[in-house]
Amino acid sequence: MSKEKGDIAEKKAISFLEKSNFEIVEKNFYAKKLGEIDIIAQRNKIYHFIEVKSANDYETAINNITSQKLSKIKRSVDFYIQKNNLNISYSIDVIIVVDDKIELLENITM
């Protein structure tokens, strides 16, 4: 996916989250060599660390969520929590963007 397509998907995801009563805390948090968290949001005192995936079809987008990617996200989340000295409840989520369809998958696991 091109950077431009990725940026468009992230903007759609942010709009979706805001309409769903999420507060956007941070975008594109880079955790040194660990990786990037696309969106950090909060709703009902729970932090949501969100990976945005976009593709021409749903199956391709879902298949791009690998155990390696989830492991990097988890390490990035741990780094963010430690760096900011937070004691929080959180969820690792994915937003799938295919054209104008957006789906939030909450609390994904490996």
Swiss-Prot record:
It comes from the Bacteria. Transmembrane segments: none annotated. One of its GO terms (molecular function) is nucleic acid binding. Signal peptide: none annotated. HAMAP family: UPF0102. Belongs to the UPF0102 family. This is UPF0102 protein Abu_0255. It comes from Aliarcobacter butzleri (strain RM4018) (Arcobacter butzleri).
